[in-house]
Amino acid sequence: MLLGAFLAISVLAAVGICAGSGVFETLGWLWVLPVSFAGTFVCLLVGFFLLMLGMSAAVDMKKPQEKDSPFYRAVAMNMIRLVVPLLRIRVVETGLEQAPASGRFLLVCNHLHEIDPAVLLRAFPKSQLAFISKREVSNMFLVGKFLHKMLGQPINRENDREALKTILSCIRVLDEDKASIAVFPEGGIRGGHVLHPLRHGVFKIALRAKVPIVVCTLRGTHTVLSKALKLQPSQVELHLVGVIPAEELAGQTAVQVGERVYEMMARDLGPELVLPRTEE
């Protein structure tokens, strides 16, 4: 784990500095040791951030990404594993044992905050999740370029023809066994931190690619950053509600599948976290 490695290196560096300077022979080590530890740790964090900046600068967003980049994915995963404990985020994961042990799938989840993809990447490290996201995400600092290298699929929901191209691209990614696809079918972060109606078009991906649908729900991600700024711990809950086998999708329409997924999510979240139908 990257955080553990950084801590170990910082301890060794601090001890080495104290031993090399001879301060262990005086009471000076009482301040030299913690200062050396903190300084080394901060330098490691800054160095890792600079590495990510350099990697981001090297990405050409105009060049199509033909395959998943293990290097960029590994760096992103390590960044997530580093940030979660630093921000004192407790992630409670349940139901993950239901996830397909092999093969590709379409993962769908409700959307509360920009950090949601990080929570899903952390929970499914071996699934090579490629996210469908709105075009604006491509311009987000660091995030857009790293998602691009991990086969991210930007979608233009305002243009049906462009949206169809993204759906067809996702189907190819699944057919060619390049990655599993993850999407937030509400179509973005909506108001009230509750579940909104789903956009059914994305379910054509599972129907055409003949892959199972992994249905998840998230709670609490919208509170993480505000609590972190107050130096308070936070809790995020990720629940894998269920898996719809590919065989059960045969003969169904995207609307039918979307309604089934919506009911699964709504039942799991409970009425207090679901927008009433009368308010749609």
Describe the residue ranges of each PLM region.
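Membrane-anchoring hydrophobic helices of lipid-metabolizing enzymes
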Residues: M1-R104
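Thr-Gly-centered strand-to-loop micro-motif
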Residues: T94, I132-K134, N156-R157, P185, ...
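A short acidic, often aromatic-flanked loop/helix-cap motif at beta-alpha or helix-coil junctions
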Residues: A99-A101, N139, D160-A163, I244-A250
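Non-catalytic C-terminal accessory region of glycerolipid acyltransferases
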Residues: F6, L164-E280
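Catalytic core of membrane glycerolipid acyltransferases/transacylases, capturing the structured
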Residues: M55-M77, P85, A101-D160
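A generic local structural motif
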Residues: N78-M79, R90-G95, P117-A118, I167-S169, ...
